[in-house]
Amino acid sequence: MSAKGLGLKNKKQWLGLAHAAARAWLDAPTLELLGNGHIHQTFLLSDQEKPADRYVLQCVNSAVYGDIDLLMRQTRMVLDRLQTASAFAAEYQLPELISTRLGESVFVQASDGEMRSWRLWRFIKGSKTCDPPENRQQIRQAAQAFGAYQRALAGMEIEQLHETIPGFLSMSGYLRQFDQVLATATLAECEQAAPWIALAQSHRQWPSALMQPNGIIHGDCKINNVLFDQQGERVLSVIDLDNNMKGHWAWDFGDLVRSVAFSRGGFDVDDYRACLQGFLTGRGSTPLINEHLIYAPSYLAFMLGLRFLTDHLGGDVYFSVPEHGDNLQRAMEQFALFQSFERNKALMGRIVSECS
């Protein structure tokens, strides 16, 4: 979550704010913090009068998503599209937004001189995340779900969805931000991060085709954005629709490979093969460019490392961290993944040739 967008409050304060907001939906809510996302504050919400009913309550980060009306409008549009994609809707449960008792998509809360927007999702019963994945079958199933998600949205016109985060996943934009922050960073900060600044400066050139949007993407294909059943045997749902927008199809694939490698301690050739097989199955017969399947993991790992590094040098204004220096550590981890992907490009190329 962003320090600016949500405010730096302790757990007790956040629980108080969330409890007050939850009354826009329920008379007798109980709740607890849920997950450790970087962007939103999220809570598991129950109804004391109907304890079997559970929900996910989120405070949307307005510093990251400046136009919350646009965000919610597009979320509804995507959900409507997924509902009409019969094959996808038959295989996976769709996330369900719950309107307030006044029929609003969000509840706007005024507190401490700040305005906060809250939304409520129905909790998908019997679901859990598998992060890290326990086996390659889970990796393959997650990849297939994300591929099928792209396929379900393929009929939408690319211009129907606007950027919910201006410049999101734009390498050229992130490089400009990096340059701007680097120009004003302190000497001490630059010296501390010198090896990673040098790495960022030496890898500024990428295939131009990989940087051009060519379809609708999920935009946040982390392994924890699919929900499995309690046995971890089947994907129940694809969640987190905030970043659905136009993009390059390979960004979703690359981000999943990056996410799996990060959660399992590094690049593994069989994990990559499972991602590739699942994603290709989910996408169906749509022709894909092999080179992009090879470059995409490096592209996404480098991009995320660059974003963490930029935020560290700029004072941690986007990604919330307990201590200054944590974003630099995150950058180092992503850059290490990037270097691992670069070392294994030839191997990935052989696997792509085998599976295509």
Name every feature range the model reports, one short phrase each:
Residues E32-N36, Q58-C59, G66-D69, K128-R140, ...:
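ATP-dependent phospho-/nucleotidyl transfer catalytic cores
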Residues H38-Q41, S46-Q48, A52-Y55, V60-R176, ...:
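Conserved ATP-binding subdomain of kinase catalytic cores across diverse folds
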Residues Q137, P287-P297:
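All-alpha amphipathic helical-bundle segments outside canonical DNA-binding/catalytic cores
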Residues D240:
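Conserved active-site aspartate in kinases
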Residues M303-S356:
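ATP/Mg2+ or Mg2+-diphosphate-binding catalytic cores
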